[in-house]
Amino acid sequence: MSLLPVMVIFGLSFPPIFFELLLSLALFFLLRRLLQPTGIYDFVWHPALFNTALYCCLFYLITCLFV
């Protein structure tokens, strides 16, 4: 069970994972914006794959915090 309740907004029911996805997406955009000036993407073979893996790792960490 998740610590977050099911949210009902304007008659639409949102499961707790929806808010975890939004939080991890916001953290991903922030972290990506911080990593771009450092030049780490010059060492990455496939930037899109790196971004996907980064988002998945952030989502996993956020989900572990709320479970």
From Swiss-Prot:
Transmembrane segments: 3-23, 47-67
Keywords: Cell membrane, Membrane, Transmembrane, Transmembrane helix
CC per GO annotation: plasma membrane
Bilayer disposition of the protein: Multi-pass membrane protein
Compartments where found: Cell membrane
Family: Belongs to the AaeX family.
Protein name listed in UniProt: Protein AaeX
Taxonomic path: Bacteria, Pseudomonadati, Pseudomonadota, Gammaproteobacteria, Enterobacterales
